[in-house]
A protein has these predicted regions:
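Glycine- and small hydrophobic-enriched segments that form the cores of compact globular domains
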Residues: 177-179
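Gram-positive cell-envelope targeting signals
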Residues: 1-64, 100, 104, 222, ...
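Soluble non-cytosolic domains of exported or imported proteins
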Residues: 98-115, 129-133, 161-170, 186-193, ...
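FKBP-type peptidyl-prolyl cis-trans isomerases
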Residues: 19-20, 40-43, 50, 69, ...
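N-terminal targeting/tethering segments
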Residues: 40-162
Length: 259
């Protein structure tokens, strides 16, 4: 109980004061624990990923995640046909991972592959900047060029303007074709024996009537297949040894938040 002095100043009994101090200490402790817990949770879900020393931005990660999301979903559904759409990403599958953990893993693998393509292209001098930001800059320049041509009444083939997804897909294919057709790349040149062997391993047809052709007529297609296979092998090997630095648990939680 509190009593009033003649001066109007309130005093607190010692017992009550002690109880008040205990409550205050407990309150501060609870707040501190909550803050620390929140800080630890923020640390756990913080986004951080580098590939071969290159920092991956959230924008780049999400862009790649969206790219692989459909195929990942098909893979998960092939394992569990009856899983609902709401539970698809939180269900645990045979590999011991949840759907969103598997999606995070697939996203990182795709990022490794794409960075391998860009690193190879930079090493060959096809591009100057192998980063995601470099790709965005090239896209802006391409879109600006197309816009100016349209304003001048000039012919523009293909799209009037690229989206990020479309431009990245176009550029990855372009860089592959550029490497494959670069005569200075010795790994893209094959002996007659290699060409003949690849031709003999399959049947080759052309046209709607599916007319079978000999090597002289199928030669360009045979060499193209050999080059594509060699390029894929080279790129996948480079991606496989890429150094990845990041907390997969945090990446998985970040991935889940995007779904």
């Amino acid at each position: 109980m509190r009593r009033q002095h003649k001066t109007g100043v309130f005093y607190m009994k010692k017992g009550k004061k002690k109880q008040w101090l205990i409550v205050l200490v407990l309150t501060v402790a609870v707040i501190a624990i909550t803050c620390v817990g929140g800080w630890k949770h923020a640390q756990k879900t913080a986004f951080s990923l580098t590939i071969n020393g290159t920092q991956i931005s959230k924008e780049e990660y999400i862009q790649c995640m969206n790219l692989v999301q459909y195929n990942t979903m098909v893979t998960l559904r092939s394992e569990k046909h009856d899983v609902s759409e709401d539970e698809l990403w939180t269900t645990t599958y045979k590999n011991g991972k949840t759907g969103y953990e598997y999606l995070a893993q697939q996203t990182v693998e795709q990022l490794k592959y794409m960075h391998a393509v860009y690193d190879i292209a930079k090493d060959k001098g096809y591009i100057k900047d192998a980063t995601y930001e470099g790709m965005l800059n090239r896209m802006e320049q391409e879109n600006q060029s197309r816009s100016e041509k349209i304003e001048k009444g000039e012919t523009v083939y293909g799209l009037k303007e690229y989206s990020t997804e479309m431009y990245q897909d176009y550029e990855l294919n372009y860089l592959q074709e550029t490497y494959m057709n670069d005569k200075s790349n010795e790994d893209m040149n094959f002996t007659e024996e290699e060409i003949q062997k690849h031709y003999d391993n399959d049947d080759w047809f052309v046209g709607e009537e599916a007319r079978e052709v000999d090597l002289s007529e199928a030669r360009a297609a045979v060499i193209d297949e050999l080059r594509r296979a060699k390029y894929e092998e080279m790129t996948e090997e480079k991606a496989k040894v890429a150094e990845v630095d990041g907390d997969m648990d945090a990446l998985s939680q970040f991935t889940l938040k995007q779904l």
